[in-house]
Amino acid sequence: MSWLKEVIGTEKAVIAMCHLRALPGDPGFDTRKGMNWVIDRAHDDLMALQNGGVDAVMFSNEFSLPYLTKVRPETTAAMARIIGQLMSEIRVPFGVNVLWDPVASFDLAMATDAKFIREIFTGAYASDFGVWDTNVGETIRHQHRIGADHVKTLFNIVPEAAVYLGNRDVCSIAKSTVFNNNPDALCVSGLTAGARTDSAILKRVKETVPDTVVLANTGVCLENVEEQLCIADGCVTATTFKKDGVFANFVDQARVAKFMEKVRHIRQ
């Protein structure tokens, strides 16, 4: 039995993303609508996800485009306000993801009592937003300093919109990441949000680290969820839950319910 059963309540868990709209400081933030509009939209998406039957949710500043690797304090503060206002209505285990700043994610997790975080913890990459370096040693020491050792860590080892600077195979990355960092899960992704995770790569990673939870991190949909969950221990899902399966849209509860009905059948 993996920690998914203990923390989320089931194996083959579906972690649904609650994508927060652009926040103060982001280029896309609408100062006329303000934070109350952002909170209301997050509330609507959260309700649709929960009522549709997902196992867990993860809040992320998905519309803070283009992303920073060291976020400014207003981003974390805005996310804390949103989650704080929604707290009384959160009925499932939840995590947080401050894109792309693992230190900020740990800080937010401690402020909100989140159970897990997802981040790019390791590696060096050429990305859409420049050369992207990490410092996992400092990040995990920060986790320990603030008393966040209980927060589960989901290591994204195939970052979206980025490639590893070194010529390393994904399986060697998976193996060394597990050996050096003891992550709670590895996330395997496609190129962007909503892009399908390659099942062959997913299978190779799981075979390389069979004792570590491996999650399909992008592109899981009604048509491929059975194939993906036959390999992975669970999935992180977002775009397929939105109206017409379009990234920019809001969550469609009917799509969520149909997806989760199929997942329940797969689990049997």
Regions found by a protein language model. Name each.
Residues 1-35, 140, 144-145:
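N-terminal amphipathic alpha-helix/helix-capping segment at the start of soluble metabolic enzymes
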Residues 10-11, 16-17, 68-96, 134-153, ...:
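Alpha-helix-loop-beta-strand connector modules within alpha/beta enzyme cores
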Residues 14-18, 57-59, 94-96, 117-119, ...:
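Hydrophobic faces of well-ordered beta-strands that scaffold small-molecule active sites
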Residues 19-44, 94-101, 155-171, 216-222:
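Active-site mouth loops of central-metabolism enzymes
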Residues 20-26, 104, 108-184:
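Conserved anion-binding
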Residues 53-78, 124-128, 183-196, 243-246:
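Glycine-rich, proline-tolerant flexible connector loops at the mouths of alpha/beta enzymes
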Residues 96, 101-114, 172-174, 205-210, ...:
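Catalytic cores of alpha/beta
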Residues 141-142, 161, 221-226, 230-268:
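Alpha/beta catalytic cores of nucleotide-metabolism and tRNA/nucleoside-modifying enzymes
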